[in-house]
C-alpha cells in the first residue's frame, strides 16, 4: 500500500475552533442565538463596499484572475509604501508561509518556533521535511531572545516571530526582532496578522536595514475578509525571486481580489473596526471574571484556573457562546482560553456566561 511521506505522517491535523453549526447540532441550540468568539473574525464584518464588489465580481466567476494578483499588489504597494516587486499575495497568510518554506526548506533544515504559537508553523515545517525547534517564551509570554538564539544552528533556515502573538496577544518590540535578525543567517518571518489592532510599530521599517526579514499580513482580521482567504507578504528582492518560482498561479480568485480592492478603499470601515476592537478589548480586560492577559490583538487570553479550559469552553458552548480552548496549542496546557473581541452586546453576554460558569464550580 502506498503511504504518505514520513514527514506528513508525523503531522498532527490542524484543529480549528468549533463553528456555529456544530455547536447548534451538539447542544440543540438555535443557530441565531449562538455567538462565535473563537476564530478572531471581525466583530463588524466586511465593508459594505467589499460585499457589493463580491456580488459584481461573481458575474465573471468563469474568467481566470490575474496570475499574480498584480492589481491587489499595486494597491497594497500604494498603501504601505513598499515596491510591488517586494509584495506577494496568497490564499490566506497560511499559503504565503507554505510557499515561502517550500522555496527554501530542504530535508535536515531546522525552523525555530517560540512557543506558544500558531500550530501551522510546525505543520508546514514538517511537510517540507524540516525539523521544528522549540523555545519557550517567558512567563508573561514575552519573547526570550536569548532562548531563541540558543536554538539556532548552522541548519536553521527560518525563525518565526508573531507580533502580536497568537494566542497570547502580546507584541514583540522592533529592538527584539532586530536583535534576532542581525544574529542569524536564516530568514526571520514576522507574522503581523493582528498588527492593525496594536499600538506598536510594524516591522516594515526593519526591512530597510535587515535583508533577511519577511513580514506576513492578512485581510482576515481588521478588514473582515476571513472568508475570502487573502494573505500577503513583504520580502526583499532576493527572497521574492525564489518565492515566485514556486508560487501557485492564480492563487487569489477574481472575487477575492475584487473584495480586497474595495475594502482598501473603505478607510472609514477599517478605522471603525479597529477602534471598536480597542474599546471592547478594554471592556473585556476590565470585566471578564478570570485573569486576563494584556493584549494588542482582536482577542484576549484568559487563565481559567482552577477550572480547566475544556470545562469552561464546554460550559460556554452549552450556553451558546463559542470560545477557543488553547489546549491544542503546543505547551499551553489545560488552563487557557482565547476569546475573540466581539460587539458590546456580545461581550456583555460573554461576561455573564463566564461569571455563571465560575460561580457554579
UniProtKB/Swiss-Prot annotation:
Residues in coiled coil: none
Catalytic reaction equation(s): L-histidinol phosphate + 2-oxoglutarate = 3-(imidazol-4-yl)-2-oxopropyl phosphate + L-glutamate
EC number: 2.6.1.9
Cofactor(s) listed in the protein's UniProt record: pyridoxal 5'-phosphate
Example GO molecular function: histidinol-phosphate transaminase activity
Enzyme class: transferase
InterPro entries: Aminotrans_II_pyridoxalP_BS, Aminotransferase_I/II_large, HisP_aminotrans, PyrdxlP-dep_Trfase, PyrdxlP-dep_Trfase_major, PyrdxlP-dep_Trfase_small
Pfam families reported for this sequence: Aminotran_1_2 (PF00155)
GO terms for biological process, alphabetical: L-histidine biosynthetic process
Pathway: Amino-acid biosynthesis; L-histidine biosynthesis; L-histidine from 5-phospho-alpha-D-ribose 1-diphosphate: step 7/9
Family annotation (PROSITE patterns): AA_TRANSFER_CLASS_2
Residue list for modification N6-(pyridoxal phosphate)lysine: 221
Keyword Transmembrane: no
Keywords: Amino-acid biosynthesis, Aminotransferase, Histidine biosynthesis, Pyridoxal phosphate, Transferase
Keyword Amino-acid biosynthesis assigned: yes
HAMAP family named in the record: HisC_aminotrans_2
Family according to the record: Belongs to the class-II pyridoxal-phosphate-dependent aminotransferase family. Histidinol-phosphate aminotransferase subfamily.
Descriptive protein name: Histidinol-phosphate aminotransferase
Organism of provenance: Methanocella arvoryzae (strain DSM 22066 / NBRC 105507 / MRE50)
Amino acid at each position: 500500500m502506498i503511504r504518505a511521506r514520513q514527514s506528513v505522517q508525523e503531522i498532527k491535523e490542524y484543529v480549528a475552533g468549533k463553528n456555529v453549526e456544530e455547536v447548534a447540532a451538539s447542544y440543540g441550540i438555535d443557530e441565531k442565538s449562538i455567538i462565535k468568539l473563537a476564530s478572531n473574525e471581525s466583530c463588524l464584518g466586511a465593508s459594505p463596499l467589499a460585499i457589493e464588489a463580491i456580488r459584481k465580481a461573481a458575474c465573471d466567476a468563469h474568467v481566470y484572475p490575474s496570475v499574480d494578483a498584480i492589481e491587489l499588489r499595486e494597491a497594497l504597494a500604494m498603501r504601505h509604501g513598499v515596491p510591488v516587486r517586494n509584495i506577494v499575495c496568497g490564499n490566506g497568510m497560511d499559503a504565503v508561509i507554505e510557499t515561502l518554506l517550500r522555496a527554501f526548506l530542504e530535508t535536515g533544515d531546522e525552523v525555530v518556533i517560540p512557543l506558544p504559537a500558531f500550530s501551522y508553523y510546525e505543520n508546514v515545517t514538517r511537510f517540507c521535511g524540516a525539523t521544528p525547534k522549540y523555545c519557550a517564551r517567558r512567563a508573561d509570554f514575552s519573547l526570550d531572545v536569548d532562548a531563541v538564539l540558543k536554538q539556532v544552528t548552522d541548519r536553521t533556515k527560518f525563525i518565526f516571530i508573531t507580533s502580536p502573538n497568537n494566542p497570547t496577544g502580546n507584541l514583540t518590540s522592533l529592538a527584539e526582532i532586530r536583535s534576532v535578525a542581525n544574529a542569524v543567517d536564516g530568514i526571520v518571518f514576522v507574522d503581523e496578522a493582528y498588527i492593525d489592532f496594536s499600538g506598536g510599530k510594524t516591522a516594515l521599517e526593519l526591512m530597510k536595514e535587515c535583508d533577511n526579514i519577511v513580514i506576513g499580513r492578512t485581510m482576515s482580521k481588521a478588514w473582515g475578509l476571513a472568508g475570502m482567504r487573502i494573505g500577503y507578504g513583504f520580502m526583499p528582492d532576493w527572497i521574492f525571486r525564489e518565492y515566485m518560482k514556486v508560487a501557485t498561479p492564480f492563487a487569489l480568485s477574481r472575487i477575492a481580489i475584487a473584495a480586497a480592492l474595495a475594502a482598501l478603499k473603505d478607510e472609514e470601515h477599517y478605522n471603525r473596526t479597529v477602534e471598536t476592537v480597542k474599546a471592547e478589548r478594554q471592556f473585556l480586560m476590565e470585566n471578564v471574571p478570570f485573569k486576563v492577559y494584556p493584549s494588542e490583538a482582536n482577542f484576549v487570553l484568559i487563565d481559567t484556573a482552577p477550572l480547566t479550559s475544556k470545562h469552561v469552553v464546554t460550559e460556554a458552548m452549552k450556553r451558546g457562546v463559542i470560545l477557543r480552548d488553547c489546549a491544542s496549542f503546543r505547551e499551553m496546557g489545560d488552563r487557557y482560553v482565547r476569546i475573540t473581541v466581539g460587539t458590546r452586546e456580545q461581550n456583555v453576554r460573554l461576561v455573564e456566561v463566564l461569571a455563571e460558569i465560575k460561580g457554579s464550580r
